[in-house]
Amino acid sequence: MEPIEQQLTELRTTLRHHEYLYHVMDAPEIPDAEYDRLMRELRELEAQRPDLITPDSPTQRVGAAPLTAFNQIRHEVPMLSLDNVFDEESFLAFNKRVQDRLKSTENVIWCCELKLDGLAVSILYENGVLVSAATRGDGTTGEDITSNVRTIRAIPLKLHGDNIPARLEVRGEVFLPQAGFEKINEDARRTGGKVFANPRNAAAGSLRQLDPRITAKRPLTFFCYGVGILEGGELPDTHLGRLLQFKAWGLPVSDRVTLCDSPQAVLDFYRNVEKDRPTLGFDIDGVVIKVNSLALQEQLGFVARAPRWAVAFKFPAQEQMTFVRDVEFQVGRTGAITPVARLEPVQVAGVLVSNATLHNADEIERLGLRIGDKVVIRRAGDVIPQVVNVVLSERPEETRPIVFPTHCPVCGSDVERVEGEAVTRCTGGLICGAQRKESLKHFVSRRAMDVDGMGDKIIDQLVEREYVHTPADLFRLTAGKLTGLDRMGPKSAQNVVNALEKAKATTFARFLYALGIREVGEATAAGLAAYFGTLEALQAATIDELQKVPDVGIVVATHVFNFFAEESNRDVIVQLLAEGVHWPAPVVINVQEIDSPFAGKTVVLTGSLSQMSRDDAKARLVALGAKVAGSVSKKTDLVIAGEAAGSKLAKAQELGITVIDEAEMIRLLGA
C-alpha cells in the first residue's frame, strides 16, 4: 500500500468515527473546526489522487447511518449538506466561481441567513397536514421522528392559507434557545440527570427521544430554510420569496434573512451577525449564503454532497482542543472552592485561553477528567471558557487523577459539602484570607458601596498586611496608613479616604447587596429593601415572611435568615452603622393609590438602555409602584428590553410575557 493510500484510509476511518459520534450518538468528541480540518485534508489528498476516491468516502456522502431504534424514512430528495468557507478570501473565491460558472460579470443577488447550530430535519405536509418528519441521517435515509416533532409548538400541525401544494417537504433546523438550555441543565443538576455540554447536544438529545413525552417537556423551536419535495403546487422563483411564502402559511422563519447585491454587502452581513451573536438568545456558528434566484440555482447545480449555489460562511471556532496541564483550586467570597483547569494556551474565538472553569467535583466526575487529558474547550460570547468534553480516544498514558482538597488551599480550614449542593466550601469564614479579600472587593464594588479608587490590588494589600478584617475596618483607615501601601502616594491615599467617607451615604438596597449574602443579587436586595423598608424589620423576618418577597424562594430566604441569625454578621452591621453608614428613611408607597401602568406589576429589565441608567430606571419604576425583579418567571408581568437583550428576552417570549422597548417604557413613565 502506498503511503498516500494509508493516509486516506486513516483519515476516512477517523472521520467516520467522529461522524458516528456526532450524528448517531449525539456525543461529539472533537470540535467542528477539527472535523472541518480533517475533511479538508482528506479532500486535498483525494484531489491529488482522484483514482483513490471510494464511493464510501466521507467526501462522497453527508453523514452517518441512523439508529435502528427508530423507524427509517428514505428522503425522496436527498438532504445534502453545505460546503464551508472560513475567511473573506475563501468567500470571495466562492463568489468568483459562481460568477464564472454563470458566465456573468454582474453581481449575483445573495440571500443570507443565520447558520443555526441545531439538528437538521425534514417535515412533510400533505394537503397542508403534517404527516411525517425525519432527521437528515446519512442524507438519503433518516430517522422517523414524527411523534417528537409534533410536540414542538413552533411547528404547525396544519398549514393555513391558500394555494398550499398537495405535497410539500419543508426543511429546517430544530434548536434550543439559550434560556431553555440553561433551564434543562439546571433541572438536571437538581435531579441528578444528564447535563448537556451545549444547546446543540441538548436539542439533538431532546428530539431523538424514544418517548415523545420527554421531548414535549423540552422548549425546542424551529426555523425553516428550504424545500425538498414539491408536488401539486407552485412556489415563488426566489429563495427569499419561498421563505416569505412559508411564513405566510404559518411556518417559522428567522427574521435575520437579508438580500445582498454584492460581495461587500455579504461581508457586512457576516460582520453584523458576528457582532450580534452573543445577544441572539440561541447558538449559531456562521451564516448561510445562497443564490437567491431558483433559475440560477438550477443552472449551477450540485457537486457530490453539496449545492454549488450555496455556502456556509463559518465564524472563528468557539471550540478548540488543548491539554490540561494542572488543576488549581480557588476560594470565592462565600467560601466556594472552584477547580480551575490550567491549559496549554490555545486561541478560541480570537482570544488566547489558558484557564477554564471546572465548576465543582461533580463536573469533574461527569467529564471523567484527569490531569494531562486532551480536552475540547468552548468559549461563547463573554462566557468564561469551559471544558466541554475529554477526547478519550487520545488520552495520554501519563494522566493522573484530580484530587479535591479536604482542607482549604488558602487557610487550611476544613471543607464541607452540604447535602443537596454541588459546591464544596471552606468553613473558615472571615479567618480565610481568600474569602476576606473577595468579600471586601464585593463590598466596595460599584454596584455595592461604590468606593471610588479602591481597587482589587489595594484590598489584597490591606488583607495581607492585616490592616482590614471586616468591612467596618475600611471606614477606620487613615491616609497615613494607606500611604504605606505599594504605589500609594499621599494624594491617592487621601482620595480613597474621601471616597470612603462619601460611600457612607448609600441606599438600603445597596447596603444589603454589599453585605454579600449568598444568592442575594442586586434585584433581590432591592426587593427585600422595598418589601421590609427597614433593617430592623428585615432582621426580624422569618423564613416564611421572607418568601413573600417577589422572586425569593425557600433557598434564598434560608440564606438571608441564616445570615442575620449569625452573631458575627450582626456585629459587623452594628459597627458599620457606628462608623456612619446610613441611608434615607423609607418612603411608604400605597400601590392602590398610584395611578401608573406599572403599579403592582413585577417588571424585569434586560439589555442596555440609552436614555437613562439601569439604576435610574429601577428607581423610577419602583417609585411608580413596580416590583423590579432580576429574572424572568411565570410571575413576571412585563419585560423591558433594551439593546442587545439576551436570554431574558428569549425566556419572556417563550412564556408569552408582554415585552416593551425602552421608548415605550419612557412613554409610560411619563403617562
Swiss-Prot record:
Pfam families: BRCT, DNA_ligase_aden, DNA_ligase_OB, DNA_ligase_ZBD, HHH_2, HHH_5, Nlig-Ia. GO terms for molecular function: DNA binding; DNA ligase (NAD+) activity; metal ion binding. SMART domains: BRCT (SM00292), HhH1 (SM00278), LIGANc (SM00532). It comes from Salmonella paratyphi C (strain RKS4594). GO terms for cellular component: cytosol. Its cofactor is Mg(2+); Mn(2+). It catalyses: NAD(+) + (deoxyribonucleotide)n-3'-hydroxyl + 5'-phospho-(deoxyribonucleotide)m = (deoxyribonucleotide)n+m + AMP + beta-nicotinamide D-nucleotide. The keyword Amino-acid biosynthesis does not apply. The keyword Metal-binding applies. It is an enzyme of class 6 (ligase). This is DNA ligase. NAD(+) binds at D32, A33, E34, Y35, D36, S81, L82, E113, R136, E173, K290, K314. Residues 593-671 form the BRCT domain. GO terms for biological process: DNA repair; DNA replication. Belongs to the NAD-dependent DNA ligase family. LigA subfamily. Keywords: DNA damage, DNA repair, DNA replication, Ligase, Magnesium, Manganese, Metal-binding, NAD, Zinc. DNA ligase that catalyzes the formation of phosphodiester linkages between 5'-phosphoryl and 3'-hydroxyl groups in double-stranded DNA using NAD as a coenzyme and as the energy source for the reaction. It is essential for DNA replication and repair of damaged DNA. The active site is at K115 (n6-amp-lysine intermediate).
